[in-house]
Each structure stands twice: as C-alpha cells, then as structure tokens.
Swiss-Prot record:
It comes from Gallus gallus (Chicken). The chain crosses the membrane at residues 53-73, 77-97, 116-136, 149-169, 184-204, 254-274, 304-324, 347-367, 373-393, 410-430, 444-464. This is Sodium/hydrogen exchanger 8. Gene3D superfamilies: 6.10.140.1330. One of its GO terms (molecular function) is sodium:proton antiporter activity. GO terms for cellular component: Golgi membrane. It comes from the Eukaryota.
Length: 574
C-alpha cells in the first residue's frame, strides 16, 4: 500500500507539474516588439550610404534641371514649356543611366527610383498649397460654381467612364481584365488633370481670362477630388465587399467621398481662419523670422492633421492655402508677405521640377508591363471621358452664366486635359495584386502622361492660333515674343492683391460702401474680412515703409561693396 501511495503521489506530482508547466506556457506573455528596427552596424551604415546617395542624386537632377530652365530663359526659347523640357531631360538622363548600368560601371537603380511616399509627404503639399495661396481669388470666386461643377462632377464623370469602360472591355476579353474597384481606382487617378503647359500658353497669348480661370481653377480642385476618389476606391478594395450589393457599395463610396471632401475642406478652412486670428492678435511683424516660421507651421499643419485622422491632406492644405492667402496674408509685415510669396514659388518650382524629371527617369527605372490594346483603349477612354465631362456641363452652365462658354472655349478646355505628376504618383501608390497588374497600371499611366504632355501640350499653341481664340493684341505679336516660361513670369512679378495696404477708412471707402457687392462678396467685405484681418493705422503703414526702405538700402550697400562692384555696375543698378 505504501508503495502504491508513493507511486500515486509521484503520478499526481508529475501531472500537476505538467499541468502547471502547460498553464505557465499558455499565459506567458509574448515578448514586445522593438520600437526601433534592430540593425547591425553594417546595415545601418549601408542604409545611411543609400540614403545619402539618394539625396545626392535628387539634388544633382534638380541642379541640372535648374540650369536647363535658366538656359531656356537666357536664350529665349520661350516656345518650349518648362515641363516638357524637364520631362525630356529626365528621359535622356534615364537612358544615359541605363547605358552606364549595362556597362556595369555603376548601379543607381535604387537612387533613380521614384518613391510615392516621398511625393505625397514632401513634394505634393508645397505644390498644392502654393497653387491655392497664389490663386487670383477675384476671378476664382466669380466662377466658383462653374469650377466646382467641372472639378467635382466632371472628374467623377470622367472617372466612371474610364473605369467603367476598362471594366466592361476586360469582361469582354478585349483588354487586360481588372475587377470593378481596380478599374474605378485607375479611372479616378487618370482623371487628375495638370495643364501646366496649357496655362503657360494661356498667359503668353492673353486668352480670355474666363477660359484661363476655368481651366486653372478646375485643375486645382480636380487634383484633390481625384485623390479622394482614388482613396475611396482603395478603401473599397481593402474591405470585403462580396456580400454587399452594388447599390450599397455605391452609397458607401458616396458617403466616404462626401466625408473626405467636405471634412477635409472644413478642416483646411478652419485651420486657415485660426492662423488669421493668431497672427492678427499676436503681433509678430517686428520679428519677421518668427512671423515667417509661424506661417510655415500653419501651412503644413492641416496636411498632417488631416492625414492623421483619415481625411485628405491635399484637400485640407488646398483650402487652407486659399483662406490663408485671403485673410492671414494681410496680417503679415510687408517683408514677410514678399518672403512668403517668393519662398512658396521657389519650393513649388523645385518640387514640380523633381516630379517631372523623375517622371522622365521612370521610363527606365522599374520593370514595365506593356499591352498595346490596353494602352490604346485607355487613351481613347481618357479623351472620350474628358469630352463627356466638358461639353455637356458647359452647355448646362451656359443657361446660368452671363459670360457664355463658347464652342471654341469648350474645345480648348477639352484639349487642355493634360495628365501630370499626380496620376503618375498615384499609380505607383496603388497596392494592386498581383505585381503584374501594378506594373501594367504604372506603365500605362506613364504613357498617357507623356502622350498628353508632349503631344497635347505641344499642340496647344498651334491650335489656339488656328482657331483664333487668342486676344487681338497677342495676335499681333511676333512668335519670338511669346513667353512660356512660368519661372520667368513668377520671378518678375509680385501679386498686387497680396501687397495691399489699406487703413480702416480706405478699406471702408473702397469695399464696404460699394453697391455692386453681392452674396458672399458682400458678407466677406462687411463682416469676415474686418474680423479676421488687421486694419492698419497710418503709423503701421509708416513703419512698414521704413522697414522696406531700410532693407532695400542695406541690400544696395552690400551689392555696391561686393568684390565685383564698380561704378558701371552702380549706374546699371540705378
């Protein structure tokens, strides 16, 4: 019995021990993942070297592009738009790098790759903010109804036509087969227009200001709408929609779009108004460096906040730029006004140049999947979708507009539907599976962008001259006097509406007592503008003029005392 009891006791102990061990094993917490990636010294050094080479390569490309733009201005090659020249240079550089890699002299494959995250976080926000900040708000708000109709409903029409056409052609085995959400995502991203070359030609030939603003205003809002539509399609792709009907899918997509559009616009507007109140009641005009720093913070703030709460940072930063230009800008000192305007233009120019250069480089930088039928049908659908967007909506708007959109203007608006950097970056950002689908979308997008920029952009000026839509004064000019350099125009001018200096009495006499102000313009002049902007006193104006005069004299003294200064140079400056 004793032996049996001992044996039983041992079995119980073993069983309990096994159970406790198993229990302990089950409840043992998993080790926490390291916050920072674990890297060896060699890996960290290699990553630093790769990042350094990427920065060097990007700056090298940018420097070469700046020299190219300078040569265009110096030798008055104004017939060639800068975007076309930079894309062409990128193609040449990409071919040169490909030859070097083939000879095994160097391998810059990692450095020449365009990273979509870098585009959306660093390059796109300054471009969008500057377009809103430098917007001619008078013409924009006078045509806000037409611009909104083209940019929102027109972009949606184009996206549905392109996406639906690709889907049904794929189901008919005419082209590569994509599912509904992938087709709509591609239709949305390829509907973003970027008429940089066209706007430059419009400015050079002095076309109708209404036509100029309709095309320019549509392109500004259209970019944000296209990004929101693409994000909507991506959101539907990530969710399991197999048990949801088509009508429910449409309602869900519509709700997501409305939330993104109006929520982001409201966030950007609110941020801009807060910045106006902050700089109105906190007087930083005597310290321009602090004032400028505060403006830069408020410029990027809505983008980060919107992205952090799952809204559209691009839409938020666009509306923030428009509001800050309309209210906050007038609370700044004259020095910071000029500094802000020129800094934004410089940064936007560098970002645009980087994007167009890497667009040309991308032809050789990643593997492509080319299908002739898919490319041809996509180009046809893009042109057809643009036509269905422009012509019916223009005829509809003419019932309500005093300044009618003529058939010639409609045709130019259709022809100016160039595609640019945003479709290219969005195509690389899509997480499509399998990989060949992503390569097909990327390759097709690059071909469409190059087709529209080089062919449509290059053919806009001959078309305008052919149909005679340019201003009569511009028609008398010699072709050599036509200037398509956006950089030269921006460098030679300061927007007069951004440097207005009005006292309280002058503002009341000029705006509030005007009888022709209606609707929002009257509300803005009567209540909003006085509430959000600082009305200057005569003492403030006097101090601002002294500050500008002091800085100008200081600059002139530094130039005159420079190592290459001479009497002839002084006479030239005078």
């Amino acid at each position: 019995m004793a032996e049996f009891a001992n044996a039983s006791h041992e079995v119980i102990n073993v069983t309990l021990g096994t159970t406790l061990a198993a229990t302990t094993k089950l409840v043992m917490p998993t080790p926490a993942k390291p916050i920072l990636p674990v890297q060896t010294g060699v890996q960290a050094q290699q990553e630093e070297q790769s990042s350094g080479m990427t920065i060097f390569f990007s700056l090298l490309v940018l420097a070469i592009c700046i020299i190219l733009v300078h040569l265009l201005i110096k030798y008055r090659l104004h017939f060639l738009p800068e975007s076309v020249a930079v894309v062409s240079l990128g193609i040449i550089m990409g071919a040169f790098i490909k030859i070097i890699e083939a000879q095994k002299l160097a391998n810059w494959k990692e450095e020449e790759m365009f990273r979509p995250n870098m585009f959306f976080l660093l390059l796109l926000p300054p471009i969008i903010f500057e377009s809103g900040y430098s917007l001619h708000k008078g013409n924009f708000f006078q045509n806000i109804g037409s611009i909104t109709l083209f940019s929102v409903f027109g972009t949606a029409i184009s996206a549905f036509i392109v996406g639906g056409g690709i889907y049904f052609l794929g189901q008919a085995d005419v082209i590569y087969k994509l599912n509904m959400t992938d087709s709509f995502a591609f239709g949305s991203l390829i509907s973003a227009v970027d008429p940089v070359a066209t706007i430059a030609i419009f400015n050079a030939l002095n076309v109708d200001p209404v036509l100029n603003m309709l095309v320019f205003g549509e392109s500004i809002l259209n970019d944000a709408v296209s990004i929101v539509l693409t994000n909507t399609a991506e959101g539907l792709t990530r969710e399991n929609m197999s048990d949801v009907s088509g009508w429910q899918t449409f309602l869900q997509a519509l709700g997501y779009f409305l939330k993104m559009f109006f929520g982001s616009a409201a966030l950007g507007t609110l941020t801009g108004l807060i910045s106006a109140l902050v700089l109105k009641h906190i007087d930083l005009r005597k310290t321009p460096s602090l004032e400028f720093g505060m403006m830069i913070i408020f410029a990027y703030l809505p983008y980060g906040l919107a992205e952090g709460i799952s809204l559209s940072g691009i839409m938020a930063i666009l509306f923030s730029g428009i509001v800050m230009s309309h209210y906050t800008h007038h609370n700044l000192s004259p020095v910071t006004q000029i500094l802000m305007q020129q800094t934004l233009r410089t940064v936007a120019f560098m970002c645009e140049t980087c994007v167009f250069a890497f667009l040309g480089l991308s032809i050789f930088s990643f593997p492509h999947k080319f299908e002739m039928s898919f490319v041809i049908w996509c180009i046809v659908l893009v042109l057809f979708g643009r036509a269905v967007n422009i012509f019916p909506l223009s005829y509809l708007l003419n019932f309500f507009r005093d300044h009618k959109i003529t058939p010639k203007m409609m045709f130019i608006m259709w022809f100016s539907g160039l595609r640019g950097a945003i479709p290219y970056a969005l195509s690389l950002h899509l997480g499509l599976e399998p990989i060949e689908k992503r390569q097909l979308i990327g390759t097709t997008t690059i071909i469409i962008v190059l087709f529209t920029v080089l062919l449509l952009g290059g053919g806009t000026m001959p078309l305008i001259r052919l149909i005679g839509i340019e201003d009569s004064k511009a028609r008398k000019r010699n072709k050599k006097d036509v200037n398509l350099s956006k950089t030269e125009k921006m460098g030679n001018t300061i927007e007069s509406e951004h440097l207005s200096e009005l006292t309280e009495g002058e503002y009341e006499a000029q705006y509030i007592k005007r009888q022709d102000l209606k609707g929002f313009m009257w509300l803005d002049a009567k209540y909003l503008n006085p509430f959000f902007t600082r009305r200057l006193t005569q003492e403030d104006l006097h101090h601002g003029r002294i500050q500008m005069k002091t800085l100008t004299n200081k600059w002139y003294e530094e130039v005159r005392q420079g190592p290459s200064g001479s009497e002839d140079d002084e006479q030239e400056l005078l």
